């Protein structure tokens, strides 16, 4: 590895330890020429996940986009940001583990709704109203009635 201080192409690893929940390795290095120390991180390069939108266009998976939607749905609700970040982590982990490079956007939306339903029901209805594009109050009321019925049966509603 090239030293960031003197550009010499020789370093020693002094310390190596897992980092970020074993997703990467933090290494403390020392340059063999100038003897200055620096830190590097090594992690697996993940292949990009592409989301196929309803109109057929593709865009790279964005954790931030999902988190923004969750935060907006949970505005003025007692839901800690950490819970929402865990939801995003779970969704990304599930999407990456399915082995597909391209995921339909409606699959992502349904995964978000499924998890949000268990986090906060009001936030779930808010998210659903935007995601499913409720056209009028009757559709909105129908979703609320399904939510109440599902709460009695304690399972996640499907379209």
From Swiss-Prot:
Keyword Nucleotide-binding belongs to the record: yes
Cofactors demanded by this protein: Zn(2+)
Annotated keywords: ATP-binding, DNA-binding, Metal-binding, Nucleotide-binding, Repressor, Transcription, Transcription regulation, Zinc, Zinc-finger
Domain ATP-cone: 49-139
GO biological process, one term: negative regulation of DNA-templated transcription
Signal peptide range in chain numbering: none
ZnF locations on chain (unnamed): 3-34
Function: Negatively regulates transcription of bacterial ribonucleotide reductase nrd genes and operons by binding to NrdR-boxes.
Family to which this protein belongs: Belongs to the NrdR family.
Protein name: Transcriptional repressor NrdR
Organism: Brevibacillus brevis (strain 47 / JCM 6285 / NBRC 100599)
